[in-house]
């Protein structure tokens, strides 16, 4: 993986941990998340502090060596764009038959030996998430990555439903792409209460950091903790009740 230099910190790092920007015809620095747009680009570390610094100190003008405007709400914009990319990747994986949702289907996928990534809604109950993460660790020998950065409604969008608590992706390209976007999103998004789940996972020998995960596609991402409400769920009814407690008629 090539390294790029962040305009905010001056530090170099892997390109998949930074975000590329290009200059539009009207002089605006716009994010190029896929790093495919033509023209000269500058790179920014994928975290909120770097984005705030780049806006405040007008670092894009310095990086492009010309006057460059940028969205004042850049950190929030980048968070939204990264969430949208993650939803899109999960949706593509679903259409390719490489992603499932629903508690039972997720458990089955984890036990099948084909799963490369477990995704849990960050506002799902810590107890339910802890149990599913323990299953992933036990069946995958630490090789199944864990992502807990999307809300239940966001995860549901990828599957064409109102919400989803659990999902699993097969090992391979989609899981690798989602893991990369999750690493970048973790610099912008604050996780909901997952401290208990993370602590319990660590107590069971489960890795709490991405660099402790085995395998090229593995990642454990939760982000900083924030005391906020969670979606109530039961272990066997997690994807049948919504955040408001209303019942679902399926467990797709």
Locate predicted features.
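N-terminal cysteine/histidine-rich coordination modules
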Residues: 1-66
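Helix-rich interaction surfaces within compact, conserved domain-sized segments
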Residues: 147-200, 220
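Helical mechanochemical/support elements of P-loop NTPase systems and associated helical scaffolds
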Residues: 2, 41, 56, 82, ...
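Short helix-coil boundary/hinge micro-motifs
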Residues: 5-8, 114, 130-144
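Catalytic cores of RNA-modifying enzymes
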Residues: 2-8, 33, 76, 80, ...
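Conserved nucleotide-binding/hydrolysis micro-motifs of P-loop NTPases
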Residues: 13, 49-51, 123-126, 153-154, ...
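Charge-patterned, long linear interaction tracts outside catalytic cores
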Residues: 197-252
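Extended interfacial segments that mediate partner engagement and assembly in macromolecular machines
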Residues: 49-128
């Amino acid at each position: 993986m090539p390294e790029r230099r962040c305009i905010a910190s001056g530090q170099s790092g892997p390109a998949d941990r930074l975000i590329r920007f290009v200059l539009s015809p009207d002089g605006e620095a716009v994010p190029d998340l896929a790093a495919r747009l033509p023209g000269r680009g500058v790179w920014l570390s994928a975290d909120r502090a770097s984005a705030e610094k780049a806006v405040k100190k007008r670092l894009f003008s310095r990086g492009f060596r010309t006057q460059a405007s940028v969205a004042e709400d850049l950190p929030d914009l980048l968070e939204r764009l990264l969430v949208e990319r993650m939803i899109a990747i999960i949706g593509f994986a679903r259409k390719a038959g490489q992603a499932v949702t629903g508690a039972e289907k997720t458990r089955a996928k984890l036990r099948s030996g084909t799963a490369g990534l477990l995704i849990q809604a960050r506002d799902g109950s810590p107890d339910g998430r802890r149990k599913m993460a323990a299953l992933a660790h036990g069946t995958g020998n630490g090789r199944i990555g864990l992502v807990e950065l999307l809300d239940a409604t966001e995860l549901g969008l990828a599957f064409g439903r109102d919400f989803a608590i659990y999902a699993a992706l097969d090992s391979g390209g989609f899981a690798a792409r989602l893991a990369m976007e999750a690493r970048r999103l973790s610099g912008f998004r604050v996780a909901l209460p997952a401290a208990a789940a993370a602590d319990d996972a660590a107590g069971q020998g489960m890795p709490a950091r991405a660099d402790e995960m085995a395998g090229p596609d593995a990642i454990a991402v939760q982000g900083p903790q924030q005391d906020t409400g969670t979606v109530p769920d039961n272990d066997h009814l997690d994807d049948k009740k919504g955040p408001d407690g209303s019942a679902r008629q399926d467990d797709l």
